[in-house]
UniProtKB/Swiss-Prot annotation:
Annotated GO CC locations: chloroplast thylakoid membrane
Name recorded for this polypeptide: Plastocyanin, chloroplastic
Species assigned in the record: Solanum lycopersicum
Principal location: plastid
Similarity remark: Belongs to the plastocyanin family.
Length: 170
């Protein structure tokens, strides 16, 4: 919340002003201006840098603490137009969110191979439908894997071109 305060200002009174007066006429100011204002905090460069340092340190600590809860981002397609998951082979902790992001605008999806996931995991609950596609650059699909083991996943339209990846859940 911001507050605004005004200062008391005394306006001087001018007497003896006449229109068309000669240059030798004098202007009389019977009162002087007085301003009452709240004291202004004075910052030194040293204090400012100290404050900036504290903000930077606090931001870094927040980022480190939040990084454990952040999602791992996997790009669907390379900047060079390659049909690949980037990274293609990675590890996450159980319960960590994985976000797959369409990088290049080609239609992609993420399907987990039911024959290459841990026993007891239902591939249909963690996969996109083979008919569903992330068509535009920036579109995402997120999944959280809680069972430890190795999971193989692929992009259905580009599996034949080698767009396959692996994640190990620790």
């Amino acid at each position: 919340m911001a507050t605004v305060t005004s200062a008391a200002v005394a306006i001087p009174s001018f007497t003896g002003l006449k229109a068309g007066a000669s240059s030798s006429s004098r202007v009389s100011t019977g009162a002087s201006a007085k301003v009452a204002a709240a004291p202004v905090a004075r910052l030194t460069v040293k204090a400012s840098l100290k404050d900036v340092g504290a903000v930077v340190a606090a931001t870094a600590v927040s980022a480190m603490l939040a990084s454990n809860a952040m999602a791992l981002e996997v790009l669907l397609g390379g900047d060079d137009g390659s049909l690949a998951f980037i990274p293609g082979n990675f590890s996450v902790s159980a319960g960590e969110k994985i976000t797959f992001k369409n990088n290049a605008g080609f239609p992609h999806n993420v399907v987990f191979d039911e024959d290459e996931i841990p026993a007891g995991v239902d591939a249909s609950k963690i996969s996109m439908s083979e008919e569903d596609l992330l068509n535009a650059a920036g579109e995402t699909y997120s999944v959280t894997l809680s069972e430890k083991g190795t999971y193989t996943f692929y992009c259905a339209p580009h599996q034949g071109a080698g767009m396959v990846g692996k994640v190990t859940v620790n």
